[in-house]
Amino acid sequence: MTITLTPRNLLRNAELYANEPALSVKAGKAPDGSWEWDTKTWKQFSDEVVSVSKSLISMGFEKGDRMSIYAYNRPEWYSCYGATQMTNGVGVGVYHTCSPEEVEWVIGDSGSKVVIIGDNPQSGGDPEKTPSRRFAKILENLPDVECVVILDGVEPIDHEMAISWTDFLEMGKEVKDSEVHSRIDGIEPDDLAALIYTSGTTGNPKGVMLTHDNWDAELSEVDRIITLNQGENYVSWLPLAHVFGQLVDNHLWCRSAIHMHVVDNALHVVDYAKKVQP
């Protein structure tokens, strides 16, 4: 069976739309009140995903290994998730608002080897509600975790397994591009691509297994409903731990090569929509 892989779509975009905008975050306001943006082109974003993939390969991240991302939407969320797809690993989204007990369950149940720690813009300024504080409380209960990556601007965790984003990217400097491409070439349609955890209304959340073929089938159905053209604006606000967030913001985004604008807080989505005009 032939399917369209998201990693191949990303590499295609890096070639066809190298200097076109892929992802933007608000950088501030100009003197006239207009918004200023920090933007990555498709080539820049693709290069970052390849760099993350190399770091994963350097630390022994194998086919089927899991990476949990405990953060709200931000550029590194997309590049880390993209790297799990590129290395034939498995992406596991963890809601940025999850309690320590909920985080422990999802990361432990998934058997995640790598954990990415970001921020929670809905913490209300309470440091105890930040992912780094919450994760630090349960790290010792997660024997499968081998590496904890602290994203820029996030409170560090004092633990031997915790490293900065910069140091993490340095890990893969000696890995060749060919090793990454070899991983992509080895992906089969029924290889596991993601674990999406349910809400856990009647018990502990359960990880729904989605393969590369599942994503391709979902994208084909979306194509029947809506057509998105290269370069059109899109606003990302739904948490990426949500299945629809992953479908559109990680997979459809690359397939259609649209220009994604990432909100800094889900509560600000209306303001972003007014400015971006998606």
Model regions and ranges:
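A short N-terminal helical cap/helix-turn-helix that marks the beginning
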Residues: 2-28, 47
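Structural core segment of the AMP-binding/adenylate-forming
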Residues: 10, 86-170
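Conserved pre-ATP/AMP-binding loop-to-beta segment of ANL
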Residues: 19-21, 150, 162-166, 173-197, ...
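A short helix-loop-beta submotif of the ANL/AMP-binding
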Residues: 23, 66, 72-100, 105-114, ...
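Conserved AMP-binding/adenylate-forming core of the ANL superfamily
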Residues: 23-82, 99-104, 164-173, 210-212
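Conserved AMP-binding A3 loop
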Residues: 39-43, 193-219
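Conserved S/T- and glycine-rich ATP-binding loop of Class I adenylate-forming
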Residues: 67, 84, 115, 192, ...
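Conserved AMP-binding/adenylation subdomain of ANL enzymes
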Residues: 88, 216-233, 240-278
